[in-house]
Amino acid sequence: MKALQTDNFRALCQEYGISTKTGYKWRERLLRYGLAGMAEQSRRPRSHADELAEGVVCEMVRLKQAHRHWGPRKIRELYLRKHGTAASESSFKRVLERAGLTEPRRRRMRAAQAGRLWSGQRAQAPNEVWTVDFKGWWYDVEGRRCEPLTVRDEHSRYVLELRRMPDARTASVRACFERLFERQGLPGAIRSDNGSPFAHVRGLLGLSRLSAWWVALGIDLERGRPGHPQDNGGHERLHRDIRTELEPGSAQQEALDLWRQEFNHERPHEALGMRCPAEVYQKSQRSYEGSPEDLEYPGMHARRVGPQGRIGWAGIPLFITSSLAGWSVGLKPLVDGRLEVWFGRLLLGWIDPTTESFLRADIRPQEAGQRKPNM
């Protein structure tokens, strides 16, 4: 009863070793409920899953069963869109846990610092960066191998392409990208790993015939480090979703199209404020007008790369890379006598007139004499 009589409530709380906030809480209970209010009270949430109407619980379970690989947050967002109001996320989690419809969440690996041709920046708008890869192959129910090509807009998470390919050759992948560019326009950059046909792991700046074509279209190249898939972590997450939700099962193109439709137009994403990718993505303003016959270099000397990857300079054949065969490069004179070698907006290296050699931009000077020409 001292709490009702003291003039120094703070000192009284210190005497009993409790905070002032706790002291006021107990005094309020005493004034409101008498001695009965001093008993320990239940800590269960006031809005508990047990208090939800049976129809609400059934609808939660039904939505989860229709989207088995979605978490409670996405299921709640879907419920909210359908009914206009929804219980708390924790209520959804408890209901789905009791129904045995949840799985432990895996810890994400931290993204590491990326390597060559990597800007270090993430897309801030649609079409700034597209990501591409081949989903690891599996066999469908008919025993046929399926290895889809996946293309994704980094900012909006919009899956631009999920295509079962006849093979992974350059010609097949280029034809797929030509159709994609015609539909969606051109991105600012394309991020890939260092595998074929997107890159040549030992070639000049990793250039392949496919990525050289991208550069000719004015598209920048971004790549992760060899052996570090987390450098393209968002795309790897997409592949985990595909593996979980589509394998094993039909690998027909119709099934892939249905999955892409749901992912883009129905599935909410936390990183997008629970919006769907289709609500964020829009076509590129850079239209695709076909492949250029060649590149022009105003103010530079142009040299066509031959079938063996060489150019002629001062009567001397210099090996550049066979990935650029048929394309022209630009030679820009420097004040020290050297010449920069450019392909589009990509600096390839330098011609040193004193040694009559080409110095690659991706090899340190001390390594130049130790490397043999590659693609």
Regions of interest found by a model, annotated:
Residues 12-13, 23-26, 34, 59-60, ...:
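Mobile genetic element proteins and their domesticated derivatives, centered on retroelements
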Residues 160-161, 349:
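A structural microfeature
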Residues 209-289, 330, 334-335:
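Charged alpha-helix within mobile-element recombinases
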Residues 264-375:
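C-terminal, beta-rich DNA-binding module of retroviral/retroelements integrases
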